[in-house]
Amino acid sequence: MKITGSKRLSQLGSAIFSEVADWKREVMNQGVDVIDLGIGSPDLPPSDRIIEAITEAVRNPAHYGYPTSEGSLAFREAVARWYRYRFGVELSPESEILTLMGSQDGLAHLALSLCDPGDMAIVPDPGYPIYSASLVLAGVEPYLLPLRAEHNFLPQLEDIPVDVAAKAKFILLNYPSNPLSAVADRAFFEHLITYAKKHDLLVVHDLAYSEMAFDGYRPISILEIEGAKEVAVEFHSLSKSFNMAGCRIAFLTGNAGAVNALKTLKSNIDYGVFSAIQAAGIAALEEDMAHNHSVAHVYERRRNVFISALAEAGWIIPPPKATMFIWAPIPKGWTSRQISREMLYHAGVVVIPGDAFGAEGEGFVRIALVQEEGRLLEAAKRIGDWLRTLE
């Protein structure tokens, strides 16, 4: 008997990621030293304090039973203290915070917990792939909200059709943005909350990159906006802020009803995050509150080095104000996929085609600053040398 996957699987994700992996494998098999600037996985280790906390916690026999699906009260209390410290936002650890196995866990399951098949949700294009994939899994109709350079990659909310705004259960946005590296100011979030209240719409904000901002810019939480908890939830992750991507720990905050819906779903799916990892998460948040631990300066230097080197080669890219990514407009005459493939085959550098994140991403590539400065300079040199051969 031949076993095949469900029809849903054929609608999931982009084949582009698989293509890029195949290209990389082929080039590496030829003995090429490939510099991978594709996947946004931090290359830095957690702080010594976090590693010490993990080491101590894994030696504690009490941490090897099933954890609670909503996360330990101690971790949720630490999140509440950190939100107060970082954003000036008060949260109830009991009803307004839910621990997650990484933000992707929550993002993948949110539509299942809030929507019924046939409902609609608004997601950005370009956007992080799980945003649309989660709707496919839940049988929810997506409305793709275009984010374009002429509007600084901010949505034009008034352009959303009235019937879409009326039908949609939620609108999902992400600032600072992956893949766009775009940012949004307080005025935008105030307008977004007003819009959501007008249309009885839940706002889902993905704030994974709040601690990775440059040039003095400090991203805000949407929950800072007056009345936001009536209509908004916010995802946050320890993956990028504290170099804990492999630990799989994050949290959802905000509207108690939405938090409880996801909590109810997850209580039927999993037993939550390993207790030792939650202990390390507490240590990470406490260290940040005590010493303002930040990785932003590392990525700011990498951004400066890489963009300057590419500029010398004639590829001018606007410097992003946040995230570990560069959303780079490509030279004329190429598609995103063509230039990504040729860059790998001729320069040995992996980047992700912009259309991997939606049709609106055509004309761009995403570059992840996940190599040390010397490797980034080498990547820029290789790209520049290759581009000069095309002149």
List each language-model region with its residue ranges.
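N-terminal small-domain helix-loop-helix segment of the aminotransferase-like
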Residues: K2-G102, H109, A284-E287, T389-E391
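Helix C-cap/helix->beta junction micro-motif
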Residues: V27-Q30, A138, K198-H199, A313, ...
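PLP-dependent enzyme catalytic core of the Aspartate aminotransferase-like
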Residues: R81, G333, E342-I352, F357-E391
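Conserved PLP-anchoring active-site segment centered on the Schiff-base-forming lysine
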Residues: S113-L135
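A short helix->loop->beta-strand "cap" motif at the edges of active sites that frequently abuts
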Residues: D119, V140, K198-L201, K229-E230
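Active-site phosphate-binding strand-loop segment of PLP-dependent enzymes
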Residues: Y143, R148-G216
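Conserved core segment of the aminotransferase class I/II
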Residues: I225, K229-E300, N304, S308, ...
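Conserved glycine-rich beta-strand-loop-beta hairpin in the small C-terminal domain of fold type I
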Residues: I282, V298-I307, I317-P329, G361
